[in-house]
């Protein structure tokens, strides 16, 4: 991480594991620790750590490839059911290794739609104060394009 010489670290956080104590306090403490960039000039270290949250889980961003939702999900299984109505999805390592992005696009999904839907979820979250069904991964994708 920081000591390895990276100047930026992006952390993708599933908020369904951070909405209760003690995990919530631990996560808030971690975000506070990295709120400012790590700067140790004598060691040649400068690193900005950024957090990108999705509530309930990253699979929401995958669903956003296909359609928008602001539905509150009680658990991950409900979200996975909605995703599986759009495309066959299995939460397994071998599935992830095959290139999810191209798989979603071959099945009529779109990264541009996912980014737009994620941005919409964040705009609604800020406007309404909603604390569920949102993703900051659209902002991450935009940042990655700029690198």
Regions found by a protein language model. Give the residues of each.
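C-terminal accessory helical subdomains adjacent to catalytic cores in phosphodiester-
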Residues: 2-8, 15-147
